[in-house]
Protein backbone atom coordinates (compact mmCIF):
# COMPACT_ATOMS: atom_id res chain seq x y z
CA UNK A 1 0.00 0.00 0.00
CA UNK A 2 2.86 2.39 0.83
CA UNK A 3 4.48 1.66 -2.52
CA UNK A 4 1.20 2.33 -4.32
CA UNK A 5 0.82 5.70 -2.58
CA UNK A 6 4.42 6.65 -3.38
CA UNK A 7 3.95 5.76 -7.04
CA UNK A 8 0.74 7.77 -7.15
CA UNK A 9 2.47 10.84 -5.70
CA UNK A 10 5.33 10.52 -8.19
CA UNK A 11 2.91 10.12 -11.09
CA UNK A 12 0.98 13.24 -10.09
CA UNK A 13 4.25 15.17 -9.85
CA UNK A 14 5.37 14.04 -13.29
CA UNK A 15 2.02 14.87 -14.88
CA UNK A 16 1.99 18.37 -13.37
CA UNK A 17 5.53 19.02 -14.67
CA UNK A 18 4.61 17.74 -18.12
CA UNK A 19 2.13 20.57 -18.57
CA UNK A 20 5.03 23.05 -18.47
CA UNK A 21 3.38 25.58 -16.15
CA UNK A 22 5.11 26.11 -12.83
CA UNK A 23 2.87 25.98 -9.81
CA UNK A 24 2.45 29.34 -8.09
CA UNK A 25 3.03 29.32 -4.38
CA UNK A 26 1.28 32.45 -3.21
CA UNK A 27 0.48 33.25 0.39
CA UNK A 28 -3.18 32.87 1.13
CA UNK A 29 -3.29 33.81 4.81
CA UNK A 30 -2.20 37.21 6.07
CA UNK A 31 -2.53 38.79 9.48
CA UNK A 32 -5.42 41.16 10.16
CA UNK A 33 -2.97 43.81 11.37
CA UNK A 34 -3.82 47.13 9.73
CA UNK A 35 -0.70 48.84 8.43
CA UNK A 36 -1.92 50.28 5.11
CA UNK A 37 0.32 50.34 2.06
CA UNK A 38 -0.24 51.75 -1.41
CA UNK A 39 0.19 49.50 -4.42
CA UNK A 40 1.23 50.53 -7.91
CA UNK A 41 -2.30 49.66 -9.05
CA UNK A 42 -3.63 52.60 -7.01
CA UNK A 43 -5.25 50.40 -4.36
CA UNK A 44 -4.70 50.62 -0.62
CA UNK A 45 -3.94 47.25 0.97
CA UNK A 46 -4.39 46.44 4.66
CA UNK A 47 -0.72 45.49 4.98
CA UNK A 48 2.30 44.46 2.92
CA UNK A 49 1.29 40.77 3.06
CA UNK A 50 -2.05 41.50 1.40
CA UNK A 51 -0.29 43.51 -1.32
CA UNK A 52 2.27 40.77 -1.96
CA UNK A 53 -0.45 38.11 -2.13
CA UNK A 54 -2.42 40.16 -4.66
CA UNK A 55 0.78 40.79 -6.64
CA UNK A 56 1.50 37.06 -6.76
CA UNK A 57 -1.94 36.18 -8.15
CA UNK A 58 -2.27 39.19 -10.46
CA UNK A 59 -1.44 38.81 -14.16
CA UNK A 60 0.03 42.33 -14.05
CA UNK A 61 2.90 43.59 -11.91
CA UNK A 62 1.93 45.21 -8.60
CA UNK A 63 4.61 46.78 -6.43
CA UNK A 64 4.73 48.77 -3.21
CA UNK A 65 4.63 52.52 -3.93
CA UNK A 66 4.70 53.78 -0.34
CA UNK A 67 3.52 53.03 3.17
CA UNK A 68 0.15 54.53 4.10
CA UNK A 69 -3.06 54.94 2.15
CA UNK A 70 -2.99 55.77 -1.56
From Swiss-Prot:
It is found in: Secreted. Expressed by the venom duct. SUPFAM superfamilies: Kazal-type serine protease inhibitors. SMART domains: KAZAL. Residues 1-20 form the signal peptide. GO terms for cellular component: extracellular region. Disulfide bonds join 26-56, 30-49, 38-70. The keyword Membrane does not apply. Its main location: secreted. One of its GO terms (molecular function) is serine-type endopeptidase inhibitor activity. The keyword Protein transport does not apply. The record marks 32-33 as: Reactive bond. Keywords: Disulfide bond, Ion channel impairing toxin, Neurotoxin, Protease inhibitor, Secreted, Serine protease inhibitor, Signal, Toxin. Residues 21-70 form the Kazal-like domain. Acts as a neurotoxin by inhibiting an ion channel. May also act as a serine protease inhibitor, since it possess the kazal serine protease inhibitor signature. Belongs to the conopeptide P-like superfamily. The cysteine framework is IX (C-C-C-C-C-C). This is Turripeptide Lol9.1. It comes from Iotyrris olangoensis.
Amino acid sequence: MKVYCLLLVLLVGLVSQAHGKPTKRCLSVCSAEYEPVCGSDGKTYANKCHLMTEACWSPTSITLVHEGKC
